[in-house]
Amino acid sequence: MSNNPADRVQDLQNFGEFGGVNPSIADSSTFTYLKASTMQAVFEGEQEGCHLYSRHTNPSTSYLCQALARMENTEAAYVASSGMGAITSCILQICESGDEIIASRTIYGGTYAFLKNFLPKLGIKTHFVDITKTNQIEALVNGNTKMVYCETMSNPLLEIADIPALASITKNTSIKLVVDNTFTPMIISPIELGADIVIHSLTKFINGASDAVGGVVCA
């Protein structure tokens, strides 16, 4: 597969239902099952590849997930209703009470507020650091550390994270390096630099027109 994100997305062939050059838009909230046994298998997690309810997936969001996974060169992607929806679901999937996060002090305000004001209620502690000083991060790593969180280029201060240096700290540990790549899609590929998970607010650079809200987790 090409190392160029644009080429990887361009090579994704997904046409409309009747051969349209663009994928069809799915505007249904629920989907038909011709056999009750199929629905039961989907509910019980025994069968994949079927759409159940558009809050989870539908053909349109599945195509978007494929394109974003191609762009970030990850195995899969999952879209959310907003950037913060993607960020919070990712963090809460990895961390639980008693865990600790090391995060950049210059991250997006909504993310900072979630880490600082909401996670302590769940017993999750965040250490905010100068992400450019890896010695600070190494000093804070302990047995409770579950995540190092940063932005490739911070919003809005444009501080640059050294992802390979951060990956050298988390490599061969259970700590996940989570990178918000909102400001630099198609320019930087965090996965190829050592990140474990990549997040985007689709509302910003990828949308580009300020007329839609969305988020994605790529891993």
Locate predicted features.
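Short, hydrophobic/aliphatic alpha-helical segments
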Residues: 3-7, 66-70, 194-200
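Conserved PLP-enzyme active-site core in the AAT-like
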Residues: 9-14, 76-219
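N-terminal "arm"/small-domain region of PLP-dependent enzymes with the aminotransferase-like
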Residues: 1-58, 66
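A broad "ordered helical/assembly scaffold" signature
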Residues: 22-25, 31-36, 50, 58-61, ...
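Conserved N-terminal alpha-helix of the aminotransferase class I/II PLP-enzyme fold
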Residues: 35-85, 110-117
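A generic structural signal for short, solvent-exposed coil/turn residues
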Residues: 2, 19, 45, 71, ...
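Generic structural signal for well-ordered, non-membrane alpha-helical segments
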Residues: 3, 20, 57-61, 108, ...
